C-alpha cells in the first residue's frame, strides 16, 4: 500500500508510477477520516510526498501520527519529490515513524520540476530543465521500485544539499509558523470564476463565493491553485507577480 499527498501533481505522478511497478494499492491521505486501515501482516507500506521547505508537509506528518493500521507494517519506505534538495527529511521522517513504534527501512528523493512560487527567488524551471527532470525521474522510479522489491534495509538515497540541518530545523519551523497562510491569495480582474482552483485544491480549502475563489484557513502552500488557473488570475501577495505556471500534463506522455 502506498499513501501519498500531492499538491501540483508531481508526487501523485510518482506515486502512480511506483504503484504500477510494485502492484500496490494507492491511497490519498486527504481521503483518510480516522478509520482503521486493514493491511496484511507482511505488507509493505510506502509514503510519497513533496518536500515543502526542506521537510515533509505537515499534513503528511500529521497523517503518520494519526493513521490507524490493523498491523504493524513489516517494511516502510518513503519517496519524496523536490526541486533540488531535501534537507534532513530522512532523519525527520524516520523520527516520526519511530514515534509510532515502527521502523523506516529506506528513503529516496526524486528531483522534479520546481513548483514553489510564493516567495522571492523561487519560481518554476525552464521547460527544457523540467523535461529533463521528468525523464530522469522516470528512470529513477524504475531503480527505486527494484530496490524496494528486494526489501533493501537501512538505505537512504536522498540529496540533502548544503546547510541541511539549518534548512530543516530552522527555516522549516519558520515556514510552518509564518507561511502556511492563504491570506495573501487574491484574484485579479482576469478571474472568470471557472472553479478550477476549487476542484484542484487537494485539501478542499477553496470555495467559490460570488464568482470568485475564497481561501480557508488550512492552506498547505502547495500553490496548486496558482498553477492551474487558466487565466493566471491567482496571485500570492506581491511574490507571484510575473511568475510562470507549471502544469505536469504539458510534459506528458514521455516520448
Tell where the protein language model's regions lie, with residue ranges.
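Iron-sulfur cluster-binding cysteine motifs and their immediate structural context
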Residues: 186-187, 192-214, 218-220, 224-241
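FMN-binding flavodoxin-like domain, especially the glycine-rich phosphate-binding loop
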Residues: 2, 7-14, 20-49, 53-174, ...
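Generic structural motif recognizing short loop/turn segments at the entrances and edges of beta-strands
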Residues: 22-25, 181-183, 211
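A mid-sequence, solvent-exposed acidic-amphipathic segment
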Residues: 160-194, 199
